[in-house]
Amino acid sequence: GLNSAQVLKPGSPLSHQDKIKTGKNGFIALMYLDDKTVVKMLGNSDLTIMGDRSGNKINKSLDIKYGRIAANVKPQKGKEFRISTPTSVASVKGTEFAIQSDPSSGDSFTLIEGLIEVTNSVTGESTQVQEGETAISTPDGSLDVAETTSDDLDGFEEASMEPPTQELRFEVEDENGNIKEILIKFN
């Protein structure tokens, strides 16, 4: 929403068309509050987030200039979640995946769970990518799908690490003298 660059702090709200960049050792986790879809940006990444309201639904998209992104997209139930890069466009239904995008060499889309459709923007060729597969889309127009190897996920280890959850528990007494336990979980 702001016109000038600023450092994001945990819990910072983001708006339609906000641009986000991470530095060399940067890491950011974003969450769409309507459906709890999580997007994780690793170091040296640049993207623009978009969320277009259509009635009571939000059509989401990420415009990735370059970088490494991991996401867990919840089933969209009549909404759309699109990812675009300089080389490709992907339509996501509800899935967990990792993307590595470089404008000069192209994109890799690695599916951990679910299904996406990837289209090479140069040729318009499309293919479906399933769990355990990686699609490679290049600026010369090629689009290939192969079985995922450990190399395809190299560098994404930090994206899969969930922060440890802390818990606070305390008891309160309501107006009728009943004891209730309150549990607060936080990272």
What are these regions (language model features)?
Residues L2-S4, H16:
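N-terminal "first-domain core" detector
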Residues A71-V73, F81-R82, A90, I99:
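Extended, compositionally simple hydrophobic/Ser/Thr-rich segments
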Residues K24-F27, Y66-I69, K77, T87, ...:
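Glycine- and small/acidic-residue-enriched microsegments that form turns, hinges, and capping elements
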Residues L30, F81-S84:
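Short conserved beta-strand and strand-loop elements enriched in small hydrophobics
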Residues D18-K24:
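A short, solvent-exposed beta-strand micro-motif common in secreted/extracellular proteins
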